Amino acid sequence: GVQSSYILWEGIENLGGKVYVTIPDRIKDGYGVNEQLVEAAIEEGADTILTCDNGIAAADALKRAKENGLTVIVTDHHEIPFCEENGERKEILPDADAIVNPKQKDCAYPFKEICGAVVAWHLIRVLYDMTGKGMKQADVFIENAAFATIGDVMELQHENRILVKEGLKRLNQTKSIGMRSLIASNKLDLGGIKAYHIGFVLGPCLNASGRLDTAKKALLLLKTKDEVDAGKLAEELVELNTSRKALTEKGIEDAMQCIETQGLSEDRVLVIYLPDCHESIAGIIAGRVRERYHRPVYV
């Protein structure tokens, strides 16, 4: 959600809006908007809650926002929760003034497999058009939408393929001080950035801050206009990613040892207890173990 948060933050500020951005702490808050975050927004005097890359499954939390008179706008790309009534699926949608999600049953948007940052970008394009700024002005966010499309491992079909091609072209000429600093801190050359570098070098650096520290560092890197601050933040993110990789490799080794020493290798489902594993990398470890043993893995 870092790229989508940046697109909405920068895009709305460019229209004169006052924005306060909150990214849930992976450990303390869990995923997405919750009642504690809504209560904090109410106490701060916010009049609108705008979600990005989440919110479609946060009906209870957003109901609280509506009860307190806030405007609620949900932008998301995840599947819509549903229940079955009389053999038919019924969507469970949050109480919101507007929901922007191509996965909705009645949404006429032709291509459904876009990431949350692309949804956010389309919203900003429409806002720019409606306010007279001009939809073309939102093209500055194409590199961010493309970055997120690659990082979220979306299918490179239809508009995603076009977006990534154009986004890579723009990223290699980026004027973003934060992005240029991140590229330099990873000892990469501006002008030679490919999808691989986003998926396996730059993207993991942005994600590492949310796993081991706070995702706000990654967001502030994209937002900053100060070269010194950008350099410091970029170096911190590279260090966090290095730590994340070391912790992941250690976790994988411990998981493999656990399987072998406890005789789990023949189990149809692998359940592995790693008491010292950092919660935020358990999923990565489980994925790597699954690649070796070809069966469901819980860590």
Q: Residue locations for each model-derived region?
A:
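Hydrophobic helix-and-loop "lid/oligomerization" segment in the mid-to-C-terminal part
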Residues: 1-48, 68, 86-87, 95, ...
